[in-house]
Amino acid sequence: MATCEVKCGAVALDIADRQNAHSMTLAVRAVVELFRLVKCEKEIHREILAFSVSHDHRSVRIYGHYAVIDVAKTTFYRHLIHEFSFSALEGKEKWTAHKFTKNVYDAWMLTHFKRLCLAVNDLPPELDFSVPPLLQGSGLSQGLASHHLLQSLAESAS
């Protein structure tokens, strides 16, 4: 799992960092819950489960996100892997974020995906994944009907 946030302005990089931290905490939490369901959470304790890249027009920060899992509590952290400037050293690091991200997808992601698949395959069959119905309609279908989009979609499908 990976996210990237790009911002501009005086505190842009910090805002991008916070948004990435939020997104990756949700993703890491989902992985932790999956591994808890199959009683294998020790496999991912303190392991990087997600990456994020935050940048503005000048600087880049690359983080790894992980969880410290105790019996009663899980705490989420991020680890700064690399921080650099695009323009420093005559642009020497201008491809660093790209190379890092490509390596994540080429090397790490396949192993991580296999680990997730094994956990999904080990889910107990008696788990109930049903979602309770919404108390109120979302308003999406009503909004589409009122704008005649449903009819347009139906016509384009035929």
Where are these regions (language model features)?
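Anionic group-transfer/hydrolysis microenvironments
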Residues: 7
